C-alpha cells in the first residue's frame, strides 16, 4: 500500500494499540499510532535506554544478551505484522474506496516496523561495539597493570645484553600501551561517533536518547580518561625508567667500549713494553714495519677513544645522568691510558729508530772487525818487531775501538733509556754481547801495544824507581855536602868524620850504581822511546852530573880526611919510634967484643928501628905535604877554617925534622961509643973503609939525581909522580948518606985525637964533605921543585877535567823551558864550578911561577922549564878564552832564569785571569738563575758591588800585566832565543783575552747599573701609584664628609694641584722605564716588564678621572642641595677606591688601633710642626667685608681652609696626613714662613700638637714647641719611611677595640688605614720645598733621609706608638669673636734662632740635640694604655729627662720610663685622671739643650658617640641657614 497524499489539514494522532516486549532486564513498549491515513510504530518505552551502554563489559554483555533476546522476540512478531499488512491489502482490495488509506497505512506501518527493527538492530550493534570497547579497555587496563607490575618489579641485569632486553621490554610495553591506547581511542571514537549518529537519526530527536547518549559518552570518556591517566602516569614512569636504563645502558655500553678499548690499549701497552726491539737489523726493520701498521691501527682506536671521551664529556656535562663519578674516573683512566699509550708509542718509535741506528752501527762495526781480523792474520805472518807490531796493533785497537764505540754507546744509551732488565732490549744485549766478545777476541790478538806499553811502563817504573832512589840518596847527601867540612881537632873526631864520609862515599857509589843501572836499562831498551823516557833520560843526566859533583866532593873530602888521619896516626907512630930510639940511644951502652953476637944483634935491631923511623918519618912528611896541597886545592867554603890544623901540621913536620936530626946525632954518638973499644988500627981501617964506601955512595947518589936534574917540568904527571915516588924511596938513603958523612966527620976527629994518620985522608975527607954539602943542597932544591911540579900538574889535571866538563855544558844549550828552580840550581852549580876553575887557574899560575923561579937556582940549571913556560902561557890564554865562554854561558843561564821567571809570572797572570773569569762567570750564573723575586734591588746592589770588586781585580791584573810586559820588553831585547817571541805571543794573547773580558765586565756592570736605575724608576713609579692611590682614596673619603660646594671645589682644586704636575713626571718615568726595559731585555721582553706599570698607570688615571668626575658631580649636586642623596654614592665611591689599594697590600696583615694611633701621633707631629708658624693670607684670596656675614666667618682662602668651615673632618680620619692646603690641613704652604708677622684678623691660631674638641673653653691652652727645621724634615721623612715600610714588613697582631666614629659605625683597620695613615713624600712636596727655602740647614737631613728611603725600602722602626683612641679628635671647631683663636705657648724665637744657628754650625763631631720625632698632644680614655715617645739625636749622645708638671719623672709601679737607642718613651699601662697634664721631654748635651711638650688629656668611659644623624642634621641646618642668608643678602 501506498499513500496518495497527506491531508491538507492537521489530523489527530491516536494510539491504536501498544505492544510490550521484555527479555530479562530489557523491556520495550511499542505503540501503534495512527494519524489520518498514516499508521506508524513508535517506541514508547525502552528499558534501559536505547543508547545506554552499561558501566562495564559484563553489564554490556548482559544488556546485549537481553537485547538480543528482546530483538528475537520482536522479530518473532514480524510475521504477524506482515500478516496484518496482508490483511490490510485484502481489506484495501475489498474496499476500493479506502484502498488509498489502507495502502498508506500499510506503507507507513511497514516502514515503521523496518525502522523499529533497524533501531533495535542498531542498538545491538551499539552494544556489541560497546562490548568491544570494554574489551579493548580491559585489555588496555590489563596491559597497564602488566606495565605497572613491570615497573614495580626489581629487574636485575648482568650485562648490557640483559639491559638491552630490559629496554626492549620497556619499548614493548610502551608500544603495546600505545597500541592499546590507540585501539581504545579509536574504539571510543567509533563508539562515540556511533552514539552521536544513533542519537541524531530520525526526524525528531528524542530527549531520552540524547540523555542516554550523553550518559554513555560520559561513561566512555571517564573510562577512557581514567585509563589514559594511568597510561600517561605509567608512560611517564616508563619513560623515566627507560631513560635511566638507557643512561645505564649507555654507560654500560660506554664501559664495554671503554673496557674493549682499555683491553686493547693495555694489551698493546704490554706488548709495547715487552716486545723486543729486535735482535738484528732485519728483525728490527720488521718490527718498525709492524710499528707503522700499529700506528695506523692506533689512529682508529684513538678516534674511538676520542668518541668515548666526547661521549663521556657529554654525559658528564648532562644533568640527567647519575653515577658520574665512576664515569669521571673511567674517563680520567682512559685519558691517562691514552696518554701512556701515546708516550709508549712515541718512545717505541724513538727506541726502534735508535735500535735501527744501533744495528746499522753494529753491522758496520762487524764489517770493520772482519777486516781487522784479516789484517791481524797478515801481521802474524810478517814477523815484525815488538815496537813496529805495537804501533800496528795500537792502530788496529784504535780502529776497533772507533768502529765499536758508536754502536756500544748507542746500545748502552738505549738500554739505559729503556730499562736494562726489560725484555725489549734483550736483542740489544745479545748484539752488544756479540760485539764485545768479538772485540775481546780481537783485542786479545792485537795485544802487542799493551805488551809494549806494559814493558815501557815497567821500564819507566824501573827507571823512575832507580831515579827515585838516586833522588832520595842525593837528598840525604846534599845536606851534608852543603856544609863546610870540619877536619876535626883530634884523631878520633877526624876518624868519625872520615867514617861518615866513607859511608857517604859508599852510599854515593851505590847511588851511582843505581844511576848506571837506570842508564843501562834505558840504553838496552832504546826501542821504548817516548817523551817520558826522554824526560827521564834528561833527568838521569842531571842527576848523574849532580851525583858526580857530590862524588867528587866526597872523594876530595875523604882524601883530605884520610890524609889528615893518616898523618896524625903516622905522627903518633913516629913519635913513639922516636921516643923508643931516643931512649935506646941514650940508655943503651954498646957491648964489648966478647959479646959481639949480642952487640951485633942489638946494633942490627937498632938499625932496623932507625930505618923504620926514617921511612915512617918521611911518609908522615909526605902526608903532611899532600894534606897541605889538598887544602890549597880546596873550593871556597869546602872546608872550615883549618889554619890551626895547618899550623899544627907544619909544627909537627918541623918537630919531626928536628927529631930526625936529634936522633941522628944520638945514633952517631952511640955508634962512636961502640967503636971506642976497638983498637986504633982496627978503627983506622974501618974509617978508611967507611970513607971509601961513603964516597962511592955519594957518587951513586949523584948518578941517581941525574934523572931529576934532567927533568922536563912540562912533562907528564905520571912520569913526575913516578919520579917523586922514587925520590921518596930514596929519602932514607939520603938520610943514611948524611948520617954516614956525619959519622966519618966525627970519627975523623976522634981518630985525630988518638994520633991516627988522618991527614992523609984529609983532602979526601974535605972533598967528601964538600960533595955531600953540594948534593944536600941539590936534593933540597930538587925536592922543592918536584913537590911544586907535582902539585902544579895535579892542579892542571883537575883544571883540565873541570874545563872539559864545562865545555860539554857549553855545547849543550840550557833548558830554557825547564823549571825555574832547576835552571836556578844549574846556574848556581855553574857559578860554583866557575869559582872552582878560577881558583885552580890562580893556583896553577902561582905554582908555575914559583917553579920557574925555583929553576933559576944554580943547582937546577939542568932542569928544563921551557915546556912549563909554554904550558903556563897556554893556560893563561885558555883561561881568558874559557872565562869569556863561562861568562857568556852564565849570562845565558841568567837569561834562562829570567825567562823562566817571566814565563812563570805570565802563567800566574793567566791563572789569575782564569780564576777571576771563572768566579765572575759563576757570579753571573748564580745571579741569572735567581727568580725575579730574588733579584730585588738589594740583591742587585750587592751584585753591583761584587762586579765592582771584579772590575778592580781586573784593573789590578792589567797593571800587573803592564809591568810584566814592560819587564819582558826590557829584559829580552837581545835575547837570541825564539822563545821570547812565544812569550810575547802568549802575553799578547792574554792581553787580548783580558781586554775582551774587561769589556764584558764593563758591559755587564753598565747593564747592572741600567737595571738598578730601571728598578729604581719602577719603584718610583710604584711609589707614585701608591701615593696617588692613597690620595685618591683619602680625597674620596674626604669628599663624603663635604657639605658645601665651596669645600668640594677647594678639595678638587687641591687635588688637581697635587695630581696635575705629577702625572707628566710619572709618564716621563714610564717612558724612561720603557726605554730602559727595551734596551735591557729587548723589544718583546721589555714590553712584558713594562705592561704592569702601564696597566697600573691607566688604572690610577682612570681612578683620578673618576674621582674628578665624582667631585664635579658632587659639586653640581651640592649646588642643588642634593646632599643626602649623594652621600651614599660617594661612600660607595670611597670604598671602590679602597679596592684600588688592596692589590699592593694583598698579603699584608691588617693594622689595628695601635697603627691608627701611630698615624694620629704622626699627624699631630706634623700639625705641631706646621702650626707654629705665623699664617699669611694671599692678597688675591682675602675674604671680603661684613657683606658676607656669617659665611665670612666660615670661609677661608683656598690654600688655608679652616676646620670649622670645612665639615669634612672625621674623628676616624684625623690620623690621615692632610694634603698641602687640603680641607683637613689647617695650614697653608706659607705657614712655613715663621718670621712673617700676622697678616689678618682672620688668621687662625691653631695648636701645635692638636685641636681641642667640642666644648673646649678658651682657657684650655695648648702648649707647643717649634722644632728646628731639621726636625721638621726628619718628621716629614719619617712619614715617608714608615709609608714605604708598611708595604715591606709584617705586623704583629694586637687585640684592640675600634673606636666609635662620629658617623655611627665602626671603622675597620684595613689596608686603607695602613696607607692613608702615613705621609708620602709627594703629598708634602710643596711644604718641603718651602721649608727648605726658608731653612737651608734642613735640606741636608731631608735629602739624606730621602736617599735613605729610596735606597732601602725595607728600613723599619719600632712600632711603639701611642695606645690612644681617636676620640680626642671628634671634630675641629673654631670659636667666633675674640675667643675664636686657641691660645698657644711657644718657645721664644730667640731660642729657636739660637737652636737653628747652633744646628747649622755644629759639625758632625759636635751636634746639638735634635728631635727627629716630636711629642704630640694625646687624649685617651681612662684605663687605656698610652705611650709618649720622642726620638732625639745629637753628638755627644744627649741625655733626656722627663718632667710632669715641673717634677722629674722616674719609673715606678704605675709607669715605665724606657730608652732604646735614640728613642725615649714613657709608657703608662692604665691611664687614670691623675696622669693628665703637661709632660716635657728635655734633651741636653755639651752642645745645647732642647725641649718638647705634650698635654695628656684623660676622658671618662661614658662619652656618647656622635651619630651620623647629628652630622647630617647639622649639615642640613648649615645648608639651610646658608641658603637663607644668601637669599636675604640678595
Curated annotation (Swiss-Prot):
Region annotation (Disordered) ranges: 1210-1241
Domain Ig-like per the UniProt entry, residue ranges: 1409-1530
Summary of the function given for this chain in its UniProt record: Plays a critical role in cortical radial and GnRH neurons migration during brain development. Regulates cortical radial migration by negatively controlling the activity of histone deacetylase 6 (HDAC6) and promotes centrosome maturation. CAMDI is required for dilation formation of cortical neurons during radial migration. Plays a critical role in learning and memory performance through regulation of AMPA-selective glutamate receptors (AMPARs) cell surface expression in competition with KIBRA.
Primary localisation category: cytoplasm
Localisation per UniProt entry: Cytoplasm; Cytoplasm, Cytoskeleton, Microtubule organizing center, Centrosome
Gene assigned in the entry: CCDC141
InterPro entries attached to this UniProt entry: Ig-like_dom, Ig-like_dom_sf, Ig-like_fold, Ig_I-set, Ig_sub, Ig_sub2, IgLON_domain, Spectrin_repeat
Entry comment on modification after translation: Ubiquitinated and degradated by the CDC20-APC/C pathway. During brain development, CDC20-APC/C complex degrades CCDC141 after centrosome translocation into the dilated area. CCDC141 is restabilized in the dilation until the centrosome enters the dilation, at which point it is once again immediately destabilized by CDC20-APC/C complex. The oscillatory regulation of CCDC141 protein is needed for proper cortical migration. Phosphorylation at Thr-91 by PLK1 affects CCDC141 degradation.
Phosphothreonine carried by residues: 91
PANTHER family to which the protein is assigned, alphabetical: COILED-COIL DOMAIN-CONTAINING PROTEIN 141, IGLON FAMILY OF IMMUNOGLOBULIN SUPERFAMILY-RELATED
Subunit structure: Interacts with DISC1. Interacts preferentially with phosphorylated forms of myosin regulatory light chain (MRLC). Interacts (via the N-terminal region) with HDAC6; inhibits the deacetylase activity of HDAC6. Interacts with KIBRA (via the C-terminal region); retains AMPAR in the cytosol after internalization.
Keyword Manganese applies: no
Name under which the protein is recorded: Coiled-coil domain-containing protein 141
Amino acid at each position: 500500500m501506498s499513500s496518495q497524499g497527506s491531508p491538507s489539514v492537521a489530523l489527530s494522532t491516536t494510539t491504536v494499540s501498544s505492544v510490550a516486549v521484555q527479555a530479562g532486564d530489557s523491556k520495550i513498549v511499542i505503540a501503534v499510532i495512527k494519524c489520518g491515513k498514516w499508521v506508524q510504530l513508535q517506541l514508547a518505552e525502552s528499558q534501559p535506554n536505547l543508547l545506554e551502554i552499561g558501566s562495564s563489559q559484563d553489564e554490556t554483555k548482559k544488556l546485549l544478551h537481553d537485547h538480543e533476546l528482546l530483538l528475537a522476540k520482536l522479530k518473532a512478531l514480524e510475521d504477524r505484522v506482515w500478516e496484518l499488512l496482508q490483511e490490510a491489502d485484502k481489506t484495501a482490495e475489498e474496499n476500493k474506496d479506502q484502498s488509498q488509506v489502507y495502502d498508506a497505512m500499510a506503507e507507513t506501518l511497514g516502514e515503521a516496523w523496518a525502522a523499529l527493527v533497524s533501531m533495535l538492530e542498531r542498538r545491538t550493534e551499539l552494544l556489541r561495539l560497546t562490548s568491544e570497547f570494554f574489551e579493548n579497555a580491559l585489555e588496555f587496563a590489563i596491559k597497564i597493570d602488566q606495565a605497572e607490575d613491570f615497573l614495580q618489579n626489581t629487574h636485575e641485569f648482568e650485562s648490557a645484553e640483559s639491559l638491552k632486553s630490559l629496554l626492549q621490554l620497556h619499548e614493548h610495553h610502551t608500544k603495546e600501551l600505545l597500541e592499546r591506547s590507540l585501539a581504545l581511542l579509536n574504539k571510543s571514537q567509533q563508539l562515540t561517533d556511533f552514539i552521536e549518529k544513533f542519537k541524531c537519526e530520525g526526524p525528531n530527536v528524542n530527549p531520552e536518547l540524547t540523555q542516554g547518549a550523553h550518559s554513555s559518552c560520559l561513561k566512555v570518556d571517564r573510562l577512557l580518561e581514567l585509563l589514559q591517566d594511568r597510561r600517561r602516569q605509567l608512560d611517564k614512569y616508563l619513560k623515566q625508567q627507560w631513560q635511566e636504563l638507557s643512561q645505564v645502558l649507555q654507560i654500560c655500553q660506554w664501559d664495554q667500549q671503554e673496557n674493549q678499548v682499555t683491553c686493547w690499549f693495555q694489551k698493546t701497552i704490554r706488548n709495547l713494553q715487552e716486545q723486543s726491539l729486535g735482535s738484528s737489523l732485519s728483525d728490527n726493520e720488521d718490527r718498525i714495519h709492524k710499528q707503522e701498521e700499529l700506528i695506523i691501527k692506533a689512529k682508529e682506536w684513538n678516534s674511538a677513544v676520542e668518541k668515548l671521551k666526547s661521549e663521556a664529556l657529554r654525559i658528564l656535562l648532562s644533568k640527567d645522568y647519575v653515577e658520574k663519578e665512576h664515569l669521571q674516573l673511567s674517563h680520567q683512566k682512559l685519558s691517562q691510558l691514552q696518554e701512556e699509550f701515546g708516550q709508549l708509542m712515541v718512545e717505541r718509535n724513538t727506541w726502534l729508530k735508535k735500535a735501527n741506528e744501533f744495528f746499522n752501527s753494529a753491522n758496520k762495526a762487524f764489517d770493520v772487525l772482519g777486516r781487522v781480523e784479516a789484517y791481524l792474520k797478515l801481521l802474524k805472518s810478517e814477523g815484525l818487531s815488538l815496537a813496529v807490531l805495537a804501533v800496528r796493533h795500537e792502530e788496529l785497537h784504535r780502529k776497533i775501538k772507533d768502529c765499536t764505540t758508536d754502536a756500544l754507546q748507542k746500545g748502552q744509551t738505549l738500554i739505559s733509556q729503556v730499562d736494562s732488565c726489560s725484555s725489549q732490549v734483550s736483542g740489544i744485549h745479545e748484539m752488544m754481547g756479540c760485539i764485545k766478545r768479538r772485540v775481546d777476541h780481537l783485542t786479545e790478538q792485537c795485544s802487542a801495544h799493551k805488551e809494549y806499553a806494559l814493558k815501557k811502563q815497567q821500564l819507566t817504573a824501573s827507571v823512575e824507581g832507580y831515579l827515585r832512589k838516586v833522588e832520595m840518596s842525593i837528598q840525604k847527601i846534599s845536606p851534608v855536602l852543603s856544609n863546610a867540612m870540619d877536619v876535626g881537632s883530634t884523631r878520633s873526631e877526624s876518624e868519625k868524620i872520615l867514617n861518615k864520609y866513607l859511608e857517604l862515599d859508599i852510599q854515593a857509589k851505590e847511588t851511582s850504581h843505581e844511576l848506571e843501572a837506570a842508564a843501562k836499562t834505558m840504553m838496552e831498551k832504546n826501542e821504548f822511546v817516548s817523551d817520558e823516557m826522554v824526560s827521564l833520560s834528561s833527568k838521569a843526566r842531571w842527576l848523574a852530573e849532580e851525583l858526580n859533583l857530590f862524588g867528587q866532593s866526597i872523594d876530595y873530602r875523604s882524601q883530605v880526611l884520610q890524609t889528615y888521619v893518616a898523618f896524625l896516626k903516622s905522627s903518633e907512630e913516629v913519635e913513639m919510634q922516636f921516643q923508643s930510639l931516643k931512649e935506646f940511644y941514650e940508655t943503651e951502652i954498646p957491648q964489648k967484643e966478647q959479646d959481639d953476637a949480642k952487640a951485633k944483634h942489638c946494633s942490627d935491631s937498632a938499625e932496623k928501628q932507625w930505618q923504620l923511623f926514617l921511612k915512617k918519618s918521611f911518609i908522615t912528611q909526605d902526608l903532611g905535604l899532600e894534606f897541605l896541597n889538598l887544602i890549597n886545592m880546596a873550593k871556597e867554603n869546602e872546608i872550615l877554617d883549618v889554619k890551626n890544623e895547618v899550623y899544627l901540621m907544619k909544627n909537627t913536620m918541623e918537630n919531626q925534622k928536628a927529631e930526625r936530626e936529634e936522633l941522628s946525632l944520638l945514633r952517631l954518638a952511640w955508634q962512636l961509643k961502640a967503636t971506642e973499644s976497638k983498637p986504633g988500627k982496627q978503627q983506622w981501617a974501618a974509617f978508611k973503609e967507611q970513607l971509601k964506601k961513603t964516597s962511592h955512595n955519594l957518587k951513586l947518589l949523584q948518578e941517581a939525581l941525574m934523572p931529576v936534574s934532567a927533568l922536563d917540568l912540562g912533562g907528564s904527571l905520571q912520569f913526575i909522580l913516578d919520579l917523586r915516588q922514587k925520590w921518596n924511596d930514596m929519602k932514607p938513603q939520603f938520610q943514611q948518606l948524611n948520617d954516614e958523612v956525619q959519622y966519618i966527620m966525627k970519627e975523623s976527629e976522634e981518630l985525630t985525637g988518638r994520633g991516627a994518620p988522618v991527614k992523609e985522608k984529609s983532602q979526601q975527607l974535605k972533598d967528601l964533605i964538600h960533595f955531600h954539602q953540594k948534593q944536600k943542597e941539590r936534593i933540597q932544591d930538587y925536592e922543592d921543585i918536584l913537590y911544586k911540579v907535582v902539585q902544579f900538574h895535579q892542579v892542571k889535571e883537575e883544571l883540565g877535567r873541570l874545563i872539559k866538563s864545562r865545555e860539554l855544558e857549553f855545547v849543550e844549550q840550557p833548558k830554557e823551558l825547564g823549571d825555574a828552580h832547576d835552571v836556578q840550581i844549574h846556574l848556581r852549580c855553574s857559578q860554583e864550578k866557575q869559582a872552582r876553575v878560577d881558583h885552580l887557574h890562580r893556583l896553577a899560575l902561582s905554582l908555575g911561577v914559583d917553579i920557574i923561579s925555583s929553576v933559576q937556582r944554580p943547582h937546577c940549571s939542568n932542569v928544563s922549564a921551557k915546556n912549563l913556560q909554554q904550558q903556563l902561557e897556554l893556560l893563561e890564554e885558555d883561561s881568558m878564552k874559557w872565562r869569556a865562554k863561562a861568562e857568556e854561558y852564565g849570562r845565558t843561564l841568567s837569561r834562562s832564569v829570567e825567562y823562566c821567571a817571566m814565563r812563570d809570572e805570565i802563567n800566574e797572570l793567566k791563572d789569575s785571569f782564569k780564576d777571576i773569569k771563572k768566579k765572575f762567570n759563576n757570579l753571573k750564573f748564580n745571579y741569572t738563575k735567581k727568580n725575579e723575586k730574588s733579584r730585588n734591588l738589594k740583591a742587585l746592589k750587592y751584585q753591583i758591588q761584587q762586579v765592582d770588586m771584579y772590575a778592580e781585580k781586573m784593573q789590578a791584573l792589567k797593571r800587573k800585566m803592564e809591568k810584566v810586559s814592560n819587564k819582558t820588553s826590557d829584559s829580552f831585547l837581545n835575547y837570541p832565543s825564539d822563545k821570547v817571541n812565544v812569550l810575547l805571543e802568549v802575553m799578547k794573547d792574554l792581553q787580548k783575552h783580558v781586554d775582551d773580558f774587561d769589556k764584558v765586565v764593563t758591559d755587564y756592570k753598565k747593564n747592572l747599573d741600567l737595571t738598578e736605575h730601571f728598578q729604581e724608576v719602577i719603584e718610583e713609579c710604584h711609589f707614585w701609584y701608591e701615593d696617588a692611590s692613597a690620595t685618591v682614596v683619602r680625597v674620596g673619603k674626604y669628599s663624603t664628609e663635604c657639605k658645601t660646594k665651596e669645600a668640594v671645589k677647594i678639595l678638587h682644586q687641591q687635588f688637581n694641584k697635587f695630581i696635575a704636575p705629577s702625572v707628566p713626571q710619572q709618564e716621563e718615568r714610564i717612558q724612561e722605564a720603557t726605554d730602559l726595559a727595551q734596551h735591557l731585555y729587548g723589544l718583546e721582553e721589555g714590553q712584558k716588564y713594562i705592561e704592569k706599570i702601564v696597566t697600573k698607570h691607566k688604572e690610577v688615571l682612570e681612578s683620578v678621572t673618576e674621582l674628578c668626575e665624582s667631585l664635579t658631580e658632587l659639586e653640581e649636586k651640592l649646588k642643588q642641595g642634593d646632599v643626602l642623596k649623594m652621600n651614599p654614592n660617594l661612600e660607595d665611591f670611597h670604598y671602590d677606591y679602597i679596592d684600588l689599594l688592596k692589590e699592593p697590600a694583598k698579603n699584608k696583615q691588617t693594622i689595628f688601633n695601635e697603627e691608627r694611633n701611630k698615624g694620629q701621633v704622626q699627624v699631630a707631629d706634623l700639625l705641631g710642626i706646621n702650626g707654629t708658624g705665623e699664617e699669611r693670607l694671599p692678597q688675591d684670596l682675602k675674604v671680603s667685608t661684613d657683606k658676607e656675614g656669617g659665611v665670612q666667618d666660615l670661609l677661608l682662602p683656598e690654600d688655608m681652609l679652616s676646620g670649622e668651615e670645612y665639615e669634612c673632618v672625621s674623628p676616624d680620619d684625623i690620623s690621615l696626613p692632610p694634603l698641602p692646603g687640603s680641607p683637613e690641613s689647617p695650614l697653608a704652604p706659607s705657614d712655613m714662613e715663621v718670621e712673617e708677622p700676622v697678616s689678618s684678623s682672620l688668621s687662625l691660631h691653631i695648636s701645635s700638637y692638636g685641636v681641642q674638641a667640642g666644648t673646649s673653653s678658651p682657657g684650655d691652652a695648648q702648649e707647643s714647641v717649634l722644632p728646628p727645621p731639621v726636625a721638621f724634615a726628619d718628621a716629614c721623612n719619617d712619614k715617608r719611611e714608615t709609608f714605604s715600610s708598611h708595604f715591606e714588613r709584617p705586623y704583629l697582631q694586637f687585640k684592640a677595640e675600634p673606636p666609635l666614629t662620629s658617623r655611627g659605625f665602626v671603622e675597620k683597620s684595613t689596608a686603607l688605614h695602613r696607607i692613608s695613615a702615613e705621609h708620602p713624600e709627594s703629598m708634602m712636596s710643596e711644604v718641603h720645598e718651602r721649608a727648605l727655602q726658608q731653612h737651608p740647614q734642613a735640606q741636608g737631613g731631608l735629602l739624606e733621609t730621602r736617599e735613605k728611603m729610596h735606597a732601602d725600602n725595607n728600613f723599619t722602626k719600632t712600632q711603639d706608638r701611642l695606645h690612644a683612641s681617636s676620640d680626642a679628635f671628634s671634630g675641629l671647631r673654631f670659636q667666633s669673636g675674640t675667643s675664636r683663636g686657641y691660645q698657644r705657648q711657644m718657645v721664644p724665637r730667640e731660642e729657636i734662632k739660637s737652636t737653628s744657628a747652633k744646628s747649622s754650625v755644629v759639625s758632625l763631631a759636635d751636634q746639638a740635640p735634635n728631635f727627629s720625632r716630636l711629642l704630640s698632644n694625646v687624649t685617651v680614655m681612662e684605663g687605656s694604655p698610652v705611650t709618649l715617645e720622642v726620638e732625639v739625636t745629637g753628638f755627644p749622645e744627649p741625655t733626656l729627662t722627663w718632667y710632669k708638671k715641673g717634677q722629674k719623672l722616674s719609673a715606678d709601679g704605675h709607669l715605665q720610663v724606657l730608652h732604646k737607642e735614640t728613642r725615649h718613651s714613657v709608657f703608662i699601662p692604665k691611664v687614670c685622671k691623675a696622669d693628665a697634664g703637661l709632660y716635657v721631654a728635655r734633651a741636653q748635651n755639651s752642645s745645647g739643650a732642647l725641649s718638647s711638650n705634650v698635654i695628656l688629656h684623660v676622658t671618662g668611659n661614658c662619652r656618647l658617640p656622635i651619630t651620623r644623624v647629628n652630622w647630617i642634621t647639622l649639615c642640613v641646618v648649615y645648608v639651610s641657614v646658608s641658603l637663607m642668608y644668601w637669599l636675604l643678602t640678595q
